[in-house]
């Protein structure tokens, strides 16, 4: 149960900031109606699945062969595999969003340091210092301020200060550079577009996985679990009758999981409709548009070189005759 709790926390982190309202409803459906029911109820229902699968024969190996024919993969294992695969796109989205947030913090810190480097120490602490009045005092004050900048914060690091010096350094507010603001806004916009594009892509992949597992469940098990299963598979000598434990309970559980998968598919389609099919097309074609824009910018920045026209020579004129 501890592994499922970790998965629930990761899914909650995936939809905490970037998901829509439909995505949060889908998370509730996945967590409550899938993870909790499979982890708590499913293990109890399918605990004696193979041991209680009894066939009316004493032939060695016949029970195991018929069980493998009746259930190529166990219901509970199929649903666990389905939950893991369906949650994989959301986990990939968590990794991508955390990575982008870390990069954004690094850019923000680098912007602060660039702003501090642009302003000289004289403009921060005054033109002539507080006690020197000349070039020597200015140099001492510059050295003092340069030593005081620690992680982008101005601190008074000198322990042996004179009584005439103030306890705190008077610092004026730094005004960010306009080019830095434009660069920061552009990078933030690109980051938001990238996260939105990746979110749409993971919703598309998640819906495709839901539909694939729904179809696979239908072809493997159908909509009911029979109580009596007839088997003539080797090494059975003749056709034998096998009995499945708790067929009605398993049928109800199977139909319930069909309904949950159908609800998840409908919610995924509703979320895609909410995000907009036009945005989805842009997200799918985002890489091509990005390459095209980079190509146009490069062609615009390159200087146009005029090719000199030497005209036709006599030999070239004769060549066209």
UniProtKB/Swiss-Prot annotation:
GO terms for biological process: cell-cell signaling; chemical synaptic transmission; neuronal action potential; visual perception. One gap junction consists of a cluster of closely packed pairs of transmembrane channels, the connexons, through which materials of low MW diffuse from one cell to a neighboring cell. It is found in: Cell membrane; Cell junction, Gap junction. This is Gap junction delta-2 protein. Residues 125-137 have a biased composition (Gly residues). It is a multi-pass membrane protein. Residues 118-141 are annotated as: Disordered. The keyword Transmembrane applies. Highly expressed in neurons. It comes from the Eukaryota. Residues 43-75, 221-252 are extracellular. PANTHER family: CONNEXIN, GAP JUNCTION DELTA-2 PROTEIN. The keyword Protein transport does not apply. The chain crosses the membrane at residues 20-42, 76-98, 198-220, 253-275. Residues 1-19, 99-197, 276-321 are cytoplasmic. It comes from Homo sapiens (Human).
């Amino acid at each position: 149960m501890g592994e499922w709790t970790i998965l629930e926390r990761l899914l909650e982190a995936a939809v905490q900031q970037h998901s829509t309202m439909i995505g949060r409803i889908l998370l509730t459906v996945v967590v409550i109606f899938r993870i909790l029911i499979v982890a708590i109820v499913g293990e109890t229902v399918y605990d004696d699945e193979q041991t209680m699968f009894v066939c009316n024969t004493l032939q060695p190996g016949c029970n195991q062969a018929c069980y493998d024919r009746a259930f190529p993969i166990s219901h509970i294992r199929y649903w666990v595999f389905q939950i893991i695969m369906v949650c994989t796109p959301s986990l990939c989205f968590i990794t991508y969003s955390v990575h982008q947030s870390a990069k954004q913090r690094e850019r923000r810190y680098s912007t602060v340091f660039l702003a501090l480097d642009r302003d000289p120490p004289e403009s921060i602490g005054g033109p002539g210092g507080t006690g020197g009045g000349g070039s020597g005092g200015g140099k001492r004050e510059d050295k003092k301020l340069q030593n005081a900048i620690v992680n982008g914060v101005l601190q008074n690091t000198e322990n042996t200060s004179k009584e005439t010096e103030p306890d705190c350094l008077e610092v004026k507010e730094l005004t960010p550079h306009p080019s830095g603001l434009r660069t920061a806004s552009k990078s933030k916009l690109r980051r938001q577009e990238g996260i939105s594009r990746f979110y749409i892509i993971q919703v598309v992949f998640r819906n495709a996985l839901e539909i694939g597992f729904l179809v696979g469940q239908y072809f493997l098990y159908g909509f009911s679990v029979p109580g009596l299963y007839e088997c003539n598979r080797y090494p059975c000598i003749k056709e034998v009758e096998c009995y499945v434990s708790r067929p009605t309970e398993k049928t109800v559980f199977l139909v319930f999981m069909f309904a949950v998968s159908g609800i998840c598919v409908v919610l995924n389609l509703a979320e895609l409709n909410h995000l907009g099919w036009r945005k989805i097309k842009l997200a799918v074609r985002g890489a091509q548009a990005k390459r095209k824009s980079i190509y146009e910018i490069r062609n615009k920045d390159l200087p146009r070189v005029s090719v000199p026209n030497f005209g036709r020579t006599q030999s070239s004129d004769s060549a066209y005759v």
